[in-house]
Swiss-Prot record:
Membrane topology: Multi-pass membrane protein
Keyword Membrane: yes
InterPro entries xrefs: Fimb_usher, Fimbrial_membr_usher_CS, FimD_plug_dom, PapC_N, PapC_N_sf
Protein name: Outer membrane usher protein FaeD
Signal peptide from the UniProt entry: 1-35
Family membership noted in the UniProt record: Belongs to the fimbrial export usher family.
One Gene Ontology cellular component annotation held by this UniProt entry: cell outer membrane
Taxonomic source organism: Escherichia coli
GO biological process: pilus assembly
Disulfide bonds: 793-811
Length: 812
C-alpha cells in the first residue's frame, strides 16, 4: 500500500490565506513523497529544524485521533465526515460499511472480499486492486480512488422512511367585502402522523350576507403504506366504487394498489377555467358538495389544484361584485392508464354509506387489472342490497395509431316501484403525431335509458317520478393541441351531450327542446423574447338552441426600470350579454418575498375600474390582499392567507411555515438560525428548524447551503438522502460541530519566529498542522486542543483565543 502525505498548511473554511502563505503552501504542496523515501528539508527555510522522527511517523502511519475530513470519491467532493482513527488503524485505515454508506460510498462486497476484516467488521480498501486511499493529515482530507467494479449503484430496495410522529394543519382562508356582499371561506387539512399511520381529516366553512352559511367536518381517515403489497390501507372515511360505475362515500376499510410507489407514475389533474368580468368569487361544487372557493381578478383564470374523489359533473359558479352569477358545467371523461407488462393493480373496499349517501346497507367493491404486452385488462364490481354493477375494460397500444380504451358496465338498481337494469359503454382514443407534434384525443360514451350510476342512485325514489329529470344518452368529447415551430401553441376542444326525452308527467318541457347541448373552447398562446400573448374563446348552445359565447386576449411585456424588473400587461374580454371590458396594469417586486401590482380599465358595463394588490411570501405564511374600485360595484377588498402549522415532538417545536406539501422534511441544524438548503425556500428558525417539501416514494437529496453556516460551525454531513412514504414528516437532523479555529503567529522566547515546518500537536499528541513562514500556524479542530506543543516549546491552552483574527503569541 502506498500512502501519501502532502505537506500543505491547514486551510480553514473561514480564513483567507495571505499571498505569502499561498506561495509557501504551493512550494510545500509540490513536495509530496512516497512513504519510506527520505525528504531533504534543508532547502526550505526553517526546514532543518523539522524533527526527522516526527516526519517519518507522519509519513509512515495514520496518526490516531478524531478528524473532520473533506471526503472525495474519484475526484468528486462527497462532503465532510468525522473520521476516528484508532491505534489499530496506524498502518491500514479500516472503514466500516456504516461509515461508507453514511458518506454515500456504496462498495461491492465481492470486490473487497479480501480486504474485509471480519473481526473489526470493516474494510481495508487498499487490499483490493487499483484502490488508493490518500489521507492528508495537514489538510484533513481523505481522497478515495475506487474503480468502477468496486462500486455499486445506490441500493434500489432501500427502506422507506415513514417519518416521525407529527401533527399539522394546512390552512387556507379568504374573505371579501364590498357594496353588495360580504363573504368568507376557510379550509383546513388536518393530519396526524403516528408510527406508520397517517390520520387525516378536513374541515371547510363559508358564510356571507346572504345567510347561506355552511360548515363541513369530515370524519377521519387513517392510512398506511404496505410495502409488501405496494398498496395503501385506509380505515375510516373512504370512497367505495369505481370510475365507471360510480362511487359513494363510506365508513369502512379499503386496500388499493398504489403504483405511484414506484417513481415515474403521474396522475391526472383536472383544470377548471373561465373568464371573470370583474373581481369575482369562483365556487366549485360536485354532487351538491362544496369543493373549493376563492377570489379571482378580472380576466381569464384557471384552477388546477382541486382534488376530486368521486365521478360526476363539476359546477363552477362565478359570482361578481354586483351579485350576478354565471354558471358553467364541466363534463369529466376519465381514461384509465395503461399498465406495464407484468404489472397489476387491485382494489378492495367495504363499508357502510356515509351521511351524504342515499344508499342503505353495506357496500362492497373489488377490482383488478393486469398489464400484458401492449394490452391492459381490467374488471370490477360494486354490490349493495339495492344496487349491483359490474364493469370491464381494456386499454390497447396501437403503435403508430395511438392508444385506445374500451370500457363497459352493467348495473341493476332497485327502486320503490321495481328494479331496472341498464348498460353503459365508453370508448377513448388518443394519439401524438411525432412529425408535427400534434396531440389528438376523442372519447364517446353511451348509456341506456334505464342505466343508473351508483353516485346518483336513490332507492327511495320511484322510477316514474317526475323529478327523475332528463337522463344522459350519449356524449362526445374531442380535442386537438398543436405547437407551431416553437412560435405558438394552439388548443381546441369540443363536446356534445344528448339526452333522452324528459318525462312529461308532472313536469314542463319546452316545445323547442331538442335534447342536445354542445360546447367548444380554444386557446392560442405564444411567447417571443419574453413577450407573452394569449387568446381564448368559448361557446356553447343549450338544448333550446340558445347560444352563449365569450372571448379574451391578453399580452404581457417585461421591462427594466432603475435596475428593477417589471411586467406590464393588458387584456380585453367580451361575452354575449356581458359587454366588452379591458384592463391594463403593471407588476413588480421589491425583493424575493414582496410583490405588488396595480392597474385599471373598463368593466363590461362600461364603468371604469381600478385595482391594487400585494402579496408577501414569508417564512411562516403566504399573505395576499386586493383592493378594487369600480363605478358599478363601488370599493371592495379581499384578503387571503395560507400556510401550515406543524408540531414535531422530536424537534420539541411548533413550526409555522408557508410550505403546505403533504410530504415534508424537517431539517434541523441545532440552535443555528439562518441556514438555507439548496432544494427549498426559507431558512432555519431560531431553533434551527426548516420545513422542506419532498417527493414521496422517490429519492430525495436535501443539501445544506454551507455558505449560510456560521464561521464556527461545520457539519459532519452536508446532505442526506431519503425515500419517504406519502404524507410522511421526516425528521432530518444534521450533526453540527462547533469547530475551533485558531490563526496564530508564534514566536519563541528569544523573539524569533518558530521555524517553518515545525509540527504542532495537541495534548493527546494528535497532529494539528505545521508552522508556515513567519511563524504562522492555522488550526482547525473539533475538540479543544489543550496545551499545544511545537517542538521544544509549549503554548498553554489558556492563552488560545477562538477567533478568526491573527493572534501573536509567544510559546513557553
Amino acid at each position: 500500500m502506498k500512502k501519501y502525505v502532502t505537506t500543505k498548511s491547514v486551510q480553514p473554511v473561514a480564513f483567507r490565506l495571505t499571498t505569502l502563505s499561498l506561495v509557501m503552501s504551493a512550494v510545500l504542496g509540490s513536495a509530496s513523497v512516497i512513504a519510506g523515501e527520505k525528504l531533504d528539508m534543508s532547502f526550505i527555510q526553517g526546514g532543518g529544524g523539522v524533527n526527522p522522527e516526527v516526519w517519518a511517523a507522519l509519513n509512515g502511519s495514520y496518526a490516531p485521533g478524531r478528524y473532520l475530513v473533506d471526503l472525495s470519491l474519484n475526484g468528486k467532493e462527497a462532503g465532510k465526515q468525522i473520521l476516528d482513527v484508532t491505534p489499530q488503524d496506524s498502518n491500514e485505515l479500516c472503514l466500516t460499511e456504516a461509515w461508507l454508506t453514511k458518506a454515500g460510498v456504496y462498495v461491492s462486497a465481492d470486490y473487497f472480499r479480501e480486504g474485509y476484516d471480519a473481526t473489526r467488521q470493516c474494510y481495508v480498501l487498499t487490499k483490493a486492486p487499483s484502490v488508493k486511499v490518500d489521507f492528508d493529515v495537514s489538510t484533513q482530507s481523505l481522497a478515495l480512488s475506487i474503480p468502477q467494479k468496486g462500486l455499486v449503484k445506490m441500493p434500489e430496495n432501500v427502506d422507506w422512511d415513514y417519518g416521525t410522529s407529527a401533527f399539522r394543519v394546512n390552512y387556507n382562508a379568504n374573505a371579501n367585502t364590498g357594496r353588495n356582499n360580504t363573504s368568507a371561506f376557510g379550509s383546513a387539512d388536518l393530519k396526524a402522523n403516528i408510527g406508520h399511520w397517517v390520520v387525516s381529516s378536513s374541515a371547510t366553512a363559508s358564510g356571507g350576507d346572504s345567510g347561506d352559511n355552511s360548515t363541513t367536518i369530515n370524519m377521519f381517515t387513517a392510512t398506511r403504506a404496505i410495502r409488501a403489497l405496494s398498496a395503501d390501507l385506509a380505515v375510516g372515511k373512504t370512497s367505495t366504487g369505481d370510475s365507471l360505475l360510480g362511487s359513494t362515500g363510506t365508513y369502512g376499510v379499503s386496500l388499493s394498489r398504489n403504483n405511484s410507489m414506484k417513481p415515474g407514475n403521474l396522475g391526472y389533474t383536472p383544470v377548471f377555467s373561465g373568464i371573470a368580468n370583474g373581481p369575482s368569487r369562483v365556487t366549485l361544487t360536485q354532487n351538491g358538495r362544496l369543493l373549493h372557493s376563492e377570489m379571482v381578478p378580472a380576466g381569464p383564470f384557471s384552477i388546477t389544484d382541486v382534488p376530486l374523489y368521486t365521478s360526476g359533473d363539476v359546477t363552477m359558479k362565478i359570482t361578481g361584485e354586483d351579485g350576478r352569477d354565471e354558471v358553467q358545467n364541466f363534463p369529466l371523461s376519465v381514461m384509465a392508464g395503461q399498465l406495464s407488462p407484468g404489472q397489476h393493480e387491485f382494489s378492495v373496499a367495504a363499508g357502510l354509506p356515509d351521511d351524504d349517501s342515499d344508499l342503505k346497507g353495506g357496500v362492497f367493491a373489488a377490482s383488478y387489472g393486469y398489464g400484458l404486452d401492449g394490452l391492459t385488462l381490467r374488471a370490477g364490481g360494486v354490490f349493495n342490497q339495492d344496487w349491483q354493477g359490474a364493469s370491464a375494460g381494456v386499454v390497447a397500444g396501437l403503435g403508430y395509431l395511438g392508444a385506445v380504451s374500451a370500457d363497459g358496465a352493467y348495473a341493476t338498481a332497485k327502486y320503490r316501484d321495481g328494479s331496472h337494469s341498464g348498460n353503459k359503454v365508453q370508448l377513448s382514443w388518443s394519439k401524438q403525431l411525432e412529425t408535427t407534434n400534434t396531440g389528438l384525443r376523442v372519447s364517446w360514451s353511451r348509456q341506456s335509458e334505464e342505466y343508473e350510476g351508483m353516485s346518483s342512485f336513490d332507492p327511495t325514489e320511484l322510477w316514474s317520478q317526475s323529478n327523475h329529470g332528463r337522463r344522459t344518452k350519449d356524449e362526445w368529447n374531442a380535442g386537438i393541441s398543436q405547437p407551431v415551430g416553437g412560435l405558438f401553441s394552439l388548443s381546441v376542444s369540443g363536446w356534445q351531450r344528448s339526452y333522452y326525452p324528459a318525462s312529461m308527467t308532472g313536469s314542463y318541457r319546452y316545445s323547442d327542446d331538442n335534447g342536445k347541448e354542445t360546447g367548444i373552447t380554444g386557446s392560442l398562446s405564444t411567447q417571443i423574447k419574453g413577450v407573452s400573448l394569449n387568446l381564448g374563446w368559448s361557446g356553447s348552445r343549450n338544448s333550446r338552441g340558445e347560444n352563449n359565447w365569450s372571448a379574451s386576449a391578453s399580452v404581457s411585456v417585461p421591462f427594466t426600470l432603475f435596475d428593477r424588473r417589471y411586467s406590464s400587461s393588458a387584456s380585453v374580454s367580451t361575452s354575449k350579454g356581458g359587454g366588452t371590458g379591458f384592463s391594463t396594469g403593471v407588476s413588480g417586486s421589491l425583493n424575493d418575498r414582496f410583490s405588488y401590482g396595480l392597474g385599471g380599465g373598463r368593466d363590461g358595463d362600461g364603468g371604469t375600474s381600478s385595482y391594487l394588490n400585494a402579496s408577501y411570501s414569508g417564512d411562516r405564511a403566504y399573505l395576499n390582499g386586493v383592493l378594487n374600485h369600480s363605478q358599478s360595484g363601488g370599493t371592495s377588498g379581499s384578503v387571503s392567507v395560507s400556510g401550515s402549522v406543524l408540531a414535531v415532538p422530536a424537534a420539541k417545536d411548533i413550526m409555522f411555515s408557508r410550505t403546505t406539501g403533504d410530504t415534508v422534511a424537517v431539517v434541523n441544524v441545532k440552535d443555528t438560525p439562518g441556514v438555507k438548503v439548496t432544494s427549498g425556500d426559507g431558512q432555519t428558525d431560531s431553533d434551527g428548524n426548516l420545513v422542506v417539501p419532498l417527493n414521496s416514494y422517490d429519492w430525495n437529496t436535501v443539501t445544506i447551503d454551507t455558505g449560510t453556516l456560521p464561521l464556527s460551525t461545520e457539519l459532519t454531513n452536508t446532505s442526506q438522502k431519503v425515500v419517504p412514504t406519502d404524507k410522511a414528516v421526516v425528521w432530518m437532523p444534521f450533526d453540527a460541530l462547533k469547530v475551533k479555529r485558531y490563526l496564530l503567529q508564534v514566536k519563541q522566547r528569544d523573539g524569533e519566529f518558530v521555524p517553518g515546518g515545525t509540527w504542532a500537536r495537541d495534548s493527546k499528541n494528535t497532529p494539528l498542522g505545521f508552522v508556515a513562514n513567519n511563524g504562522v500556524l492555522m488550526i482547525n479542530t473539533v475538540d479543544a486542543p489543550g496545551d499545544i506543543t511545537l517542538g521544544q516549546c509549549r503554548i498553554p491552552a489558556a492563552r488560545l483565543q477562538d477567533t478568526e483574527k491573527l493572534q501573536e503569541i509567544t510559546c513557553e
